[in-house]
């Protein structure tokens, strides 16, 4: 998705 948003999800 974005930057850390992919990491959080």
UniProtKB/Swiss-Prot annotation:
Reaction it catalyzes: 2 a phenolic donor + H2O2 = 2 a phenolic radical donor + 2 H2O
Biological processes per GO annotation: hydrogen peroxide catabolic process
Gene Ontology MF term list: lactoperoxidase activity; metal ion binding
Subcellular localization: Secreted
Primary residence: secreted
Cofactor, how bound (note): Binds 1 heme b (iron(II)-protoporphyrin IX) group per subunit. Binds 2 calcium ions per subunit.
Cofactor(s) this protein requires: heme b; Ca(2+)
EC number(s) from the headed UniProt entry: 1.11.1.7
Protein biosynthesis recorded as keyword: no
Coiled-coil regions, chain positions: none
Keywords noted in UniProt: Calcium, Heme, Hydrogen peroxide, Iron, Metal-binding, Oxidoreductase, Peroxidase, Secreted
GO cellular component, one term: extracellular region
Protein family membership: Belongs to the peroxidase family. Classical plant (class III) peroxidase subfamily.
Biological function: Removal of H(2)O(2), oxidation of toxic reductants, biosynthesis and degradation of lignin, suberization, auxin catabolism, response to environmental stresses such as wounding, pathogen attack and oxidative stress. These functions might be dependent on each isozyme/isoform in each plant tissue.
Protein name as catalogued: Peroxidase 6
Organism name: Capsicum annuum
